[in-house]
């Protein structure tokens, strides 16, 4: 039982590692919270620091979700791995290492799925990138993909999977509430795939 509680804390702490902040400060000498949207996530890193930093942060944020979700399997615990994944996402959104001001749950949630259901992860990746290249709205693509994740979980019939996806989707949409207003008002920035970035 003690091991279980400790691993939940570890999962939260893994999620709390603010890679956008670390990359910004160490690699570029800036606090990314003071630039762009101020969000500690991949999208703001792409827009503020460029492709190299953006990919680095996004991959790192995905992997911390994957690693946290794998903890019960690594340590042989008979507890559903998605609970540990949820702890990591909570840490990503409300990181103790960054004054509880984190990202929007997308990349780390993807990492949770990568560990728990690679097939669903692959399907959602196709959905996300299809929407992104069609609409050029990262936020809209993220929210719609989150809803599709809920649908996929319902189809699976896995009750804990359904609960976890509903919680994650709710968190993703809640963290994008300001984006929803900007999309409606047509002021939401679009991804610029032709822009040259370092």
UniProtKB/Swiss-Prot annotation:
Pathway: Lipid metabolism; phospholipid metabolism. It is an enzyme of class 2 (transferase). Pfam families: G3P_acyltransf. It comes from the Bacteria. The chain crosses the membrane at residues 4-24, 71-91, 113-133, 147-167. It is a multi-pass membrane protein. It catalyses: an acyl phosphate + sn-glycerol 3-phosphate = a 1-acyl-sn-glycero-3-phosphate + phosphate. Probably interacts with PlsX. This is Glycerol-3-phosphate acyltransferase 2.
């Amino acid at each position: 039982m003690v091991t279980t509680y400790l691993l939940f804390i570890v999962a939260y702490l893994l999620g709390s590692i603010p890679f956008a902040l670390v990359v910004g400060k160490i690699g570029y000498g800036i606090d990314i919270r003071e630039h762009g949207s101020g969000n500690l996530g991949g999208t703001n890193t792409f827009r503020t620091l460029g492709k190299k930093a953006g990919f680095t942060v996004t991959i790192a944020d995905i992997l911390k979700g994957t690693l946290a979700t794998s903890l019960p399997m690594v340590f042989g615990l008979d507890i559903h791995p998605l609970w540990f994944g949820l702890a990591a996402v909570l840490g990503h959104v409300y990181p103790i290492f960054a004054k509880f001001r984190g990202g929007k749950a997308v990349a780390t949630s993807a990492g949770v799925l990568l560990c728990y259901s690679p097939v669903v992860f692959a399907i959602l990746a196709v959905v996300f990138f299809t929407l992104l290249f069609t609409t050029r709205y990262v936020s809209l693509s993220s929210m719609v993909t989150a809803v599709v994740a809920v649908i996929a979980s319902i189809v699976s019939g896995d009750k804990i999977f359904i609960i976890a996806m509903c919680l994650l989707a709710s968190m993703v949409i809640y963290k994008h509430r300001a984006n929803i207003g900007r999309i409606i008002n047509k002021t939401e920035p679009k991804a610029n795939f032709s822009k040259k970035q370092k």
